[in-house]
């Protein structure tokens, strides 16, 4: 009796493993033109810090991040951030970048696209450990590639604590105001897929890497113990970055299913160099609450 029961249990386990192993996914439709290239995101957490001027670092900034298509080739974009928590303040700390990008060329290719099926995050406060688990597959899809030229305005205000040898000048305001110009490469995908159990779902993403030259003529009048000391000047900088837009489609293109908060995320990462800030990192997350075509 016990032997038969054990054999039945083993059989059920093997059957469940076999069923799970046989679960497959297939692409039923793919068209990157269905994806929404434009977005308006509420930026709820961004860090913006220059490593040569940590006094001017923003530990927590909020704002908006947007891209709006004027036509098939021309798009305008803007990033506006206000610092809620800075290491030092000398006036309001903010970053504002606004410009446009123009499509130079585009092509569509068949690619294997990674699709995230599930993600889970757990924190064990007792043992102070974190566990992340996810499941993903690669599915065939059409990917649109677009080369763009870009340019615009770049303005940032923060604090500056300038040091020279063993001389530490008074904390003052540092304002970057100038322009950027560069190139970008937009990759867009949208697909519909079906699992072997019949479940249907949509997936897609927009990835926007770019590289810019920053022309920021910056002049700072330094003071030492409240008295005028010297004037310093720098002009050139650069940045390279990427914006990743998850789920660039609406409920209508998602089998009439609501898209969750984190699935509607916009991730941004910039690295580069700014006058007197040196090497800098700007990175954060936004909630994509409006999508545009």
Roles of regions detected by a PLM:
Residues 96-111, 277-293:
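Outer-membrane beta-barrel "beta-signal"
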Residues 24-35, 40, 146, 154-276, ...:
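Outer-membrane beta-barrel transmembrane domain signature
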Residues 74, 79-213:
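Gram-negative (and chloroplast) outer-membrane scaffold detector with strong preference
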Residues 62-64, 98-100, 179-183, 238-242, ...:
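Membrane-embedded beta-strands of outer-membrane beta-barrel proteins
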């Amino acid at each position: 009796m016990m032997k038969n029961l054990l054999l039945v249990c083993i059989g059920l386990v093997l059957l469940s493993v076999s069923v799970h192993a046989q679960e497959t996914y297939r692409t039923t439709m793919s068209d990157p033109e269905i994806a929404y290239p434009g977005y308006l995101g509420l930026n709820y957490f961004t860090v913006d810090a220059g490593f040569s001027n940590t006094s001017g670092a923003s530990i927590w900034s909020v704002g908006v991040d947007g891209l709006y298509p004027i036509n098939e080739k021309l798009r305008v974009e803007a990033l506006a951030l206000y610092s809620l928590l800075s290491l030092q303040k000398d006036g309001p700390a903010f970053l504002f970048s606004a410009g446009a990008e123009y499509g130079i060329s585009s092509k569509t290719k068949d690619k294997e696209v990674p699709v995230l099926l599930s993600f889970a995050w757990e924190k064990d406060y007792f043992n102070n450990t974190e566990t992340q688990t996810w499941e993903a597959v690669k599915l065939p899809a059409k990917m649109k590639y677009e080369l763009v030229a870009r340019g615009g305005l770049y303005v940032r205000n923060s604090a500056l604590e300038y040091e020279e040898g063993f001389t530490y000048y008074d904390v003052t305001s540092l304002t970057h105001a100038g322009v950027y110009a560069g190139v970008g490469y937009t990759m867009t995908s949208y697909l519909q897929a079906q699992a072997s159990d019949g479940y249907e779902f949509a997936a897609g993403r927009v990835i926007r890497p770019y590289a810019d030259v920053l022309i920021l003529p910056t002049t700072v009048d330094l003071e030492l113990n409240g008295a005028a000391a010297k004037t310093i000047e720098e002009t050139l900088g650069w940045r390279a970055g990427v914006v990743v837009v998850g789920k660039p489609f609406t409920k209508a293109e998602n089998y009439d299913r609501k898209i969750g908060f984190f699935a509607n995320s916009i991730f941004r990462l910039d690295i580069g160099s700014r006058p007197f800030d040196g090497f800098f990192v700007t990175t954060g997350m936004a909630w994509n609450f409006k999508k545009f075509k």
